[in-house]
Amino acid sequence: MLTGKNALVTGASRGIGRAIALELAKRGAFVVVNYNGSEDAANETVAAIKAAGGDAVSVRCNVSDFTACQEMIESLIKEYKHMDILVNNAGITRDDLLMRMKESDFDAVINTNPVSYTHLTLPTILR
């Protein structure tokens, strides 16, 4: 059981992230549903968690932005005292061959996928 644990799930407004958030809540964790796109979809995830007897909130944060991640983690620690579980689920793709991909698209993929993990874990590790 995860009762008393706080979990942050990135990209939790839909798909795999939503399923992970629902499962963590089912096991007793308080879940922070991170999203960057649809607030409505994130709120639907929170509502589904609450309807199943769990507890959750939604928080918008572009995980490719280091400063935004630092601010989100600091805010969560201030509000909830500790974050015990981090599920780095957020990810994007730009469907094109690397040789035809625009630099901005490449940067967005790299900054959201592997780099965001550092953005989210570093502020916590340095505490």
Regions of interest found by a model, annotated:
Residues 29-44:
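Conserved glycine-rich Rossmann-like NAD(P)H-binding loop of the short-chain dehydrogenase/reductase
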Residues 97-98, 102-110:
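Substrate-binding pocket helix/loop in short-chain dehydrogenase/reductase
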Residues 6, 13-14:
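Conserved glycine-rich cofactor-binding loop
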Residues 90-94:
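Conserved NAD(P)H cofactor-binding loop of Rossmann-fold oxidoreductase domains
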